Amino acid sequence: GKDVTHRWPELCDLAGSVNASTAILDAELVVFDDHGRPDFGLVQQSGFGTDREAVLHVFDVLSIDRTDTIGLAYLDRRRLLEALVEPSDNWLIPAHRVGDGTALLAATAAHQLEGVIAKRVDSVYHPGTRAKDWIKIKNRTVVELVVGGYTEGTGHRAGTFGALLL
């Protein structure tokens, strides 16, 4: 892998907040926009002299002190994770909720967030694959538009639309 430590120095102290000698965590860097919403584009810009700091969202634990945890149920891994990582301003364990997913999805829509990841509480971790036990449910925005034209596709889009002119 490529060392990118210099881009996010705010994350360098994470190891000191992990209550183990070694751990493998599943996490994602998040940078928030001016409205407090995650913005992937800002993640790409962060660490290059911008004033926006990234926050590491730690979702899961795959190993603790060289002991594999991927075969444990999600709720068991979640309990281990909460005992393992001490949150700070620069990393956190996002809140999770059991039940009433419909209300949670509606709340994310009201805040103009992307959606939720629904996980079976008894699911094991499947590295490198999409598992049916974890489903990404996105909020959809419906907009009525008039199509004024299109461009022809090229490359992998050959024989289809390249772009719609709206």
Q: Where are the regions that the model predicts?
A:
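Catalytic cores of nucleic-acid ligases and guanylyltransferases
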Residues: 1-165
